[in-house]
Design a protein with these regions (language model features):
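Cross-family detector of peptidyl-prolyl cis-trans isomerase
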Residues: 1-192
């Protein structure tokens, strides 16, 4: 069973069970295998090279799709009433305008927020935790650093963030795919 788990985690999807069993039997009984260890190693190297190329092609296709989807989404948002497009590509809509202090790029802020992917799935929310987040504006994604500086305490904005102002080409493993444009609703509670 351990061998099967190791094979699966290595990405091996297809196995000729007859050949596998014959090779296993030959090794365990001391018989001469049909394929030498050197040939088996070369076959595995070839298999893994093909698997890696396939995975790379899939990742490139997914990345291209994410970029196109993000560009289309942002182009549509840019046409909506009330949406402001900044030179950086960051877009926002004022939901509520506050009248308190505005932060600088190096200030710490207390915010409530909710982040979603373009398909609407939520990947993070301080509202769900029922606890505002505190962070330095120089310690977050560039879209947040730029966008939150536009807000006054008491404001609530919706940001539409292109991938290059979010998590970029790498994404955030397990939560945000590479090249993902994001939507954030941010409520600036306090500049600290």
């Amino acid at each position: 069973m351990s061998i099967a788990h190791n094979m699966m985690s290595s990405g091996i999807k297809e196995v000729n069970f007859e050949d596998f069993a014959a090779g296993l039997k030959a090794v365990l009984t001391g018989a001469q295998p049909e394929v030498s260890f050197e040939e088996a190693g070369q076959l595995l190297d070839k298999y893994f090279a093909a698997l890696e190329a396939e995975q790379k092609a899939q990742m490139e296709a997914m990345s291209a799709m994410m970029r196109e989807e993000g560009e289309g989404y942002l182009a549509a948002k840019a046409k909506e009433d009330g949406v402001v497009v900044l030179p950086s590509g960051l877009q926002y809509k004022v939901l509520t305008e506050g009248n308190g202090k505005k932060p600088s790029a190096t200030d710490k802020v207390k915010c409530h927020y909710e982040g979603t992917l373009l398909n609407g799935s939520k990947f993070d929310s301080s509202y769900d935790r029922n606890e505002p987040a505190v962070f330095g504006l120089n310690q977050v994604i560039p879209g947040w650093t730029e966008g939150v500086q536009l807000m006054s305490e008491g404001s609530k904005y919706e940001f539409y963030i292109p991938y290059d102002l979010a998590y970029g080409a790498h994404g955030a493993p397990g939560a945000i795919p590479p090249y993902a444009a994001l939507t954030f609703v941010v409520e600036l509670l306090e500049v600290l």
